[in-house]
Amino acid sequence: FCEEGSELPTGVSVGHYSVDAANETVSNAAVAELSCPSGSYCSGGAKEECTTLGTYCPEQSTEPVACPAGSYCRTPAEIIDCDAGQHCEESGTEEPRLCSAGYYCATPASEEECDSGTFCAEGNVLPTGVRVGHYSVDASGNPTLSMAVAELPCPAGFFCVGGDKTACGTSGTFCPELSTEEV
């Protein structure tokens, strides 16, 4: 750009774009430079709108930047932190998603499998312990000790401890509903 009265052109600074006397973006006959605003990126004196989903462009950007893990970018002008129970593990996330059933998300950047004796519904921040006299099930309702999504009451004829469901098998014993041992 050439400021009024200058004999030689001045290179446009990194993160800036060139404008004419009316502050309109131009590539020729530029008289000044302006700082690249948030939501745009500027390179070689030109200003471009940041339009790629999952990216953002802070002030003085020279290119779109992927939204960092643990956050998401609905618009290129802002980064939004994911809430607990949401999952934003990868960079470039456009929208958060709830933590998957069978997993928990103590931090938005990680999704951990539920351990034995616990279950995790969709969006769980932490695992929920299986209650006494109950057993854990997968998404199809089948008994499981890993990646459980819910708990069910222990039916008659079974005893349930630590999320496990075991049939009563000793002769002369029975197991009423919610049993934790053979009686």
Predicted regions and their residues:
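Disulfide-rich, cysteine-dense extracellular ectodomains and adjacent flexible linkers of secreted
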Residues: 1-183
